[in-house]
UniProtKB/Swiss-Prot annotation:
SUPFAM superfamilies: P-loop containing nucleoside triphosphate hydrolases (SSF52540). A double ring-shaped homohexamer of HslV is capped on each side by a ring-shaped HslU homohexamer. The assembly of the HslU/HslV complex is dependent on binding of ATP. Coiled coil: none annotated. It is found in: Cytoplasm. One of its GO terms (cellular component) is HslUV protease complex. Keywords: ATP-binding, Chaperone, Cytoplasm, Nucleotide-binding, Stress response. It comes from the Bacteria. Belongs to the ClpX chaperone family. HslU subfamily. This is ATP-dependent protease ATPase subunit HslU. The gene is hslU. The lineage of its organism: Bacteria, Pseudomonadati, Pseudomonadota, Alphaproteobacteria, Hyphomicrobiales. ATP binds at I18, G60, V61, G62, K63, T64, E65, D248, E313, R385. GO terms for biological process: protein unfolding; proteolysis involved in protein catabolic process. It comes from Rhizobium etli (strain CIAT 652).
Length: 435
């Protein structure tokens, strides 16, 4: 789990997301509170409940991006799901308890990687022995093995092809849910897993180079050294205490007019979410998981519905409200130039693969921001995503002809931008006026 201070978390988010300081502060405090709770006396620790967050803001202002970056920072089981993917219990589709089962799977993966790192040195030694077995056979004399070991460590045999046997994790046969049995999705039944256990762990033969074989062999040997029961126990504990669920598109399941039909199912999803957010026990194939201390961050654009359209009980379980403001011209400028992987940096790097140098003047960046703001105000406000439309239109000709212009330098100024997006800016969606 991360030990970053709220200020450090916000500064990390600032590298990728422009503005929205209030939302960043809220998630930074919530993340830090996870760590603070772990430092408390056990008797008080159980009483401290997470303060769930509701982020409200138009599309394209950074709600989902905050969740993506937070997942990398959290160092804890984290899952992002769309509320629209779930249906009420009794309907065909996934029920909301699947969120927690998926979160436990994320926790299992995190703990397994941590345990593998702890035994990597031992696993590397065993992997080297297996590579030597593949190179010289198990009956070779000690002198021959040592001779090949030296060559192996010097990298002389890196490109030599060998046949190795590794555990077959078996992605061939997928999983399936038993229809008509709500309790049966205690985890999707995985056929490969069942057959693997029945046959005492299957292996498969792989032909690969010596250098590439180490990845599979080290993973294989690491898994032999770690105890799966310990991993499962730790993963469940980590999920219960540090787990974070990011619920996107929650506005899409808000009842708008109280109408029947599909609306019943939408409200049903909200009702199913209530116990999950409040705290319940979910059955998973790794055992029961309590959701009392899992942090829920919900977000939605609320273009058509309002936060007050959510069930009052669900509103009460999302006590912290954060509003993300729409983006202005200055924000667009900063998105184009200041973020870690800004669009301009991305396009420059893409063109450099064709030996083409791309340069944007300051007035070109101003013009790009202007066009994006104008289109958002006149057509539909889709936030920062509008910049991708504008950039693609501006660079369409350059991208198409790049292989023929290899070795040249191109400077893009405001005149070039206006020339290539002029029709885009004036041609607001006329189709809406055509009968």
């Amino acid at each position: 789990m991360t030990t970053f201070s709220p200020r450090e978390i916000v500064s990390e988010l600032d590298r990728y997301i422009i503005g929205q300081h209030e939302a960043k502060r809220a998630v930074a405090i919530a993340l830090r509170n996870r760590w603070r709770r772990q430092q408390l006396d056990p008797s008080l620790r159980d009483e401290v409940m997470p303060k769930n967050i509701l982020m409200i803001g138009p599309t394209g202002v950074g709600k989902t991006e905050i969740s993506r970056r937070l997942a990398k920072l959290a160092g804890a089981p984290f899952i992002k799901v769309e509320a629209t993917k779930f249906t009420e219990v009794g309907y065909v589709g996934r029920d909301v308890e699947q969120i927690i089962r998926d979160l436990v799977e994320v926790g299992i993966g995190l703990v397994r990687e941590k345990k593998r790192a702890e035994v990597q040195a031992k696993a590397h030694v065993s992997a080297e022995e297996r590579v030597l077995d593949a190179l010289v056979g198990t009956t070779a004399s000690p002198a021959t093995r040592e001779n090949f070991r030296k060559k192996l460590r010097d990298g002389e045999l890196d490109d030599k092809e060998i046949d190795i046997e590794v555990a077959d994790t078996g992605s061939g046969m997928g999983g399936f849910e038993i229809p008509g049995m709500p309790g049966a999705n205690i985890g999707v039944l995985n056929l490969s897993e069942m057959f693997g256990k029945a046959m005492g762990g299957r292996t498969k033969k792989v032909r690969t180079t010596v250098k590439a074989s180490y990845t599979d062999l080290i993973r294989d040997e690491s898994d032999k050294l770690i105890d799966n029961e310990v991993i499962q126990r730790e993963a469940v504990r980590s999920t219960e205490n540090d787990g974070i669920v990011f619920l996107d598109e929650i506005d899409k399941i808000a009842a708008r007019d109280g109408g029947m039909g599909a609306g019943v199912s939408r409200e049903g999803v909200q009702r199913d979410l209530l116990p999950l957010v409040e705290g319940t026990t979910v059955s998973t194939k790794y055992g029961p998981v309590k959701t009392d201390h899992i942090l829920f961050i919900a977000s939605g654009a609320f273009h058509v519905s309002k936060p007050s359209d959510l069930l009052p009980e669900l509103q009460g379980r999302l006590p912290i409200r954060v509003e993300l403001r729409p983006l202005n011209k200055e924000d667009f400028r900063r998105i184009l130039t200041e973020t870690e992987a800004s669009l301009i940096r991305q396009y420059r790097a893409l063109m450099e693969t064709e030996s083409l140098s791309l340069d944007f003047t300051e007035d070109a960046i101003d013009a790009l921001a202007d066009v994006a703001v104008h289109l958002n105000s006149s057509v539909e406000n889709i936030g920062a995503r509008r910049l991708q439309t504008v950039m693609e239109r501006v660079l369409d000709d350059i991208s198409y002809n790049a292989p023929d212009r290899s070795g040249t330098a191109i400077t893009i100024d405001a005149a070039y931008v206006r020339e290539h997006v002029g029709d885009l800016a004036q041609n607001t969606d006329l189709s809406r006026f055509i009968l």
